[in-house]
Amino acid sequence: MYFLSIPFPNINPEIITFGGFSLKWYGVAYVVSILIGWRYILIISKNTSIISKKNIDDLVIWVAIGIILGGRLGYSLFYQPSEHFQNPLKILEIWNGGMSFHGGLLGVIISIIIFSKNKKINILYISDMLA
């Protein structure tokens, strides 16, 4: 039955290392995804006056912060709670890995709510753009 299985690829998580700094595939995926989303939102909102380009730029920053903070806090609370409650400063050690999708999603939702209230833009319009 082994011949029917697909072997799991053994991919090095680091793309390149410079001394103590290493560039990881996971981080590159985050950056590329945010940049593609930013470009997409600029394209679909080009023919509308509901949201300005400056507000879109601000929204992308809010979303990126929501992804990082929410993903890291979600990982800390859902997967390593006892370790992070004993040493809360470990939550800040993002270079050691640990992000959760559902934490990032909650972070984005919270950041969109805050952004829409601050800029007085309908949250349904923003949610529709990001969907």
Predicted regions and their residues:
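Hydrophobic, membrane-interfacing alpha helices
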Residues: 1-131
